[in-house]
Swiss-Prot record:
Lineage of source species: Bacteria, Bacillati, Chloroflexota, Chloroflexia, Chloroflexales
Protein name: Small ribosomal subunit protein uS7
Alphabetical list of SUPFAM superfamilies matching this protein: Ribosomal protein S7 (SSF47973)
Highest rank taxon of the organism: Bacteria
Subunit field text: Part of the 30S ribosomal subunit. Contacts proteins S9 and S11.
Keywords on record: Ribonucleoprotein, Ribosomal protein, RNA-binding, rRNA-binding, tRNA-binding
GO terms under cellular component: small ribosomal subunit
PROSITE patterns: RIBOSOMAL_S7
CDD domains: uS7_Bacteria
Gene name for this UniProt entry: rpsG
GO molecular function, one term: tRNA binding
Matching Pfam families: Ribosomal_S7
Job description of the protein: One of the primary rRNA binding proteins, it binds directly to 16S rRNA where it nucleates assembly of the head domain of the 30S subunit. Is located at the subunit interface close to the decoding center, probably blocks exit of the E-site tRNA.
């Protein structure tokens, strides 16, 4: 345990265009090697492209895609007397959105043949429509938790 106590988390300022903290976090996750302006351009253009295809507001698409992609339950390994069990636990809201963002970006990067803007837009549209790689990932996590429901009581120890 640290002696100095817990450090207060710095608040993330909202992004300039939508005044949303979630969009700013997403931009920060898309960013590589400190190139924030490039990450902003990618995210904003992807949201514009998705809005153009779905004929809905950008922020609504983004927030719905995040809600659809975020897991409500996951498994965590817990060691009990020599055996390691995968114990299902509820996911806190911060981690929920963080995982959804991470999965969206990973799925977009895994797609091939198109610029990142188009890949990210396609992944956001898929998540908005409850289809695609990101949603499959979430369902796999839920399936794992369901399969290990018998060990749920270890989470309460």
């Amino acid at each position: 345990m640290p002696r100095r106590g817990v450090v207060e988390r710095r608040p993330i300022p909202p992004d300039a265009r939508y005044n949303s903290v979630l969009v700013q976090k997403f931009i920060n996750k898309v960013m590589e090697r400190g190139k924030k302006s490039l990450a902003e351009r990618i995210v904003y253009q992807a949201l514009d492209l998705a809005a153009e295809k779905l004929k809905k507001p950008q922020l609504e698409i983004f927030e719905q895609a995040l809600r659809n992609a975020s897991p409500s339950i996951e498994v965590k390994p817990k060691r009990v007397g020599g055996a390691t069990y995968q114990v299902p636990v509820e996911v806190k809201s911060d981690r929920r959105y963080s995982l959804a963002m991470r999965w969206l970006i990973m799925s977009a990067r895994a797609r091939t043949g198109k610029p990142m803007v188009e890949r990210l837009a396609a992944e956001l549209i898929d998540a908005y429509n409850n289809t695609g790689t990101t949603i499959k990932r979430k369902e796999d996590v839920h399936r794992m938790a369901e399969a290990n429901r018998a060990f749920a009581h270890y989470g309460r120890l």
